[in-house]
Amino acid sequence: MSGTPDTLFALAAGATRTAAIEGISAAGADPALMAHTPSADAELLTYGHTVRAPVVPVSPSGCPTPAVITRAVRELVGFESLVIDAGLAEPTGAPTVTTGISPGADIRDETPVPDAEAAYSAAYEFGHGLHTDELVIAETIPGGTTTAMGVLAALGEPRIVSSSLPNNPVALKERVVDDALAASGLEQGDLAGEPVAAVRQMGDPVLAVVAGLAAGALDAGIDVTLAGGTQLATAGALVRHDGVTEPMTLATTSFVAGDDSAGIDALAADQDLAVTVTDPAFEARESHPAMAAYLDGEAKEGVGMGGALALAAEAGIGMDSVRNAIISVYDRV
């Protein structure tokens, strides 16, 4: 990562009905409003406040969306950003690049992402046509770690993912993925080497877009950083299963790296991803609600938080300045 003016930050925002399964996600205090989370995150990244979204996303305990952190870093570093509509379920006031993909169905449906191939191709073309030295790719999709587990299962990779919840509901996710495999008539590893099919039958629209975007950019000679945790590592697995071997970096947070249930180091190593971990040292402001919940194990990552923090560090911006900016954005929104 370089953090230069030739760095472009792309946020893929979408939805999956898998998020409606009780106990799966903390991405929104009210399940009825969870579908607005990606749309709100896009607005927060773009404007620093919501525009059309009815709420600022918070967890049931009040943990603010990682978009607050990413926006704070953007205000400090000044990196260029864009939002890709990767299956939004609700409208956003942020300008978006369209891929034509619809919101994903529950992965326990036979074909939760029927338009995966078209979206992958559209994202590939967009990534291949970009003029930038470095592309940092992020995601926002409630329920995305469960769909990531589904894709890993289809590809035959270890089924280990993180969670936005303090206690990762691994057993629940495993049951959902087992049901999804059965619904699609699949066994573990049946779609190894078939990344688009893995997303179509076991994934979500954001994974299709992120993987296509990364593959296109890499084929164009652009450096690619996957900004996130196990979901972005899963996107890396999709790229590898498509036969792309160029170097990629996974930039994540200390919260994901410290989550024993996530196994991020092993997952990244399996996909030949270099790992950058950034610690925002929230302990220094542990009484502030914008940071306390992260220290308690909530959220951990999302909206490219790890990638944004890495860009701040590489720009020589201290984490004390980052924490102050986070408080400023938190108070504003």
Swiss-Prot record:
UniProt name for this protein: UPF0284 protein VNG_1572C
Leader sequence residues: none
Organism from which the protein derives: Halobacterium salinarum (strain ATCC 700922 / JCM 11081 / NRC-1)
Gene3D superfamilies: 3.40.50.10210
Molecular function GO labels: nicotinate-nucleotide-dimethylbenzimidazole phosphoribosyltransferase activity
Entry's family note: Belongs to the UPF0284 family.
CDD domains: DMB-PRT_CobT
